[in-house]
Amino acid sequence: MNSLVATPPVPPHFYETSCRSASYSMSSTNASVNRKRKAEDDCLPSDDTRMSASPSGSPALHPRPLAPRHLKRSRPNVSGRPLSLPRLMETLDTDALRSVLRSLCDRHPEIASEVMHTAPRPSVSAALEVLNNYQSTLQSSFPLGGNPSSDYAYNRVRQHLTNLLEALNDFTPHFLPPNESQPSTSLNYLDGATDIIHRLPRWTTPQHNLEKYAAYEEMSKAWCLVIREAAKRGGGIQLQYGGWDQKLAKHNETAGGKLQDAVNELNQSLGWIGGNVGNPSYPGGSNSQGDMSIRQQLMSGTYGAGLPLKVGPW
């Protein structure tokens, strides 16, 4: 009674078609891929072609604006030319520049006058430096070995000694009154210049020492002039509190008493100020221990203490 519904069998041609269709589709797919790859390979360029061909997709480079360069145009004809005055003066040392300036002043007196009014006043240190340079040149010109005070040595250094003494005679009046109004400046110069005279050589032949003695004499006169002028300025405070009495006494001792006139002038100037009071060794000195100068009495407030005080009409 049971009835079985039988599934109709699959026709044989269906299996053949299905299997063939799967294999066919795979083979056709592989064939199309192979054909595509072959076409792409045919279209790809070779290595030589890629290296020789310029890139087509490279970005374009935009030129950047450059700053203008200011270059001197070269001269069409190169020729020699002298230096300009500023460049020429840069190559001159002190001695060469001094020589050129001296030559111009000698040929053009008006330039010499302008230089005299334009150049700054030489300081004491600058003047003493020049004199010390002459002194160094003199010392270095002595012959090696032998007697440095002999006539042979004197003849060897005579010109350098003359140059030093001439420079000393030229510089000294510049620092004396009335050309120099400051006593301190004059005294400082004389102090240094006297030291230079002390260092001058002493010769065996007495005649050769006359130049040094003459320099001491001129220096003593210069000391006297400056001391007199300093005593008039400010009551001689510069002389009293500058220690110049001791300095000048030492110079006189080193010079062998050739500055005694200057020492006497200083003692006389300090006498009315109050220096050397009670010392009978200087002219005009007082022997009274209680004698005081008018200046000291004024400064201590004792001036006129022993005088009667008058009241009322004179």
From Swiss-Prot:
InterPro entries: Cut8/Sts1_fam (IPR013868), Cut8/Sts1_sf (IPR038422)
Compartment annotation: Cytoplasm; Nucleus
Keywords: Cytoplasm, Nucleus, Protein transport, Transport
GO CC annotations on file: cytoplasm; nuclear membrane
Chain segments carrying region Disordered: 25-85
GO molecular function: proteasome binding
Keyword Cytoplasm: yes
Gene Ontology annotations of biological process type: nuclear protein quality control by the ubiquitin-proteasome system; proteasome localization; protein transport
Pfam families associated with the record: Cut8
Keyword Cytoplasm carried by entry: yes
Reported function: Involved in ubiquitin-mediated protein degradation. Regulatory factor in the ubiquitin/proteasome pathway that controls the turnover of proteasome substrates. Targets proteasomes to the nucleus and facilitates the degradation of nuclear proteins.
Record family assignment: Belongs to the cut8/STS1 family.
Subunit structure: Binds the proteasome.
Full protein name: Tethering factor for nuclear proteasome STS1
Species in which this protein is naturally found: Arthroderma gypseum (strain ATCC MYA-4604 / CBS 118893)
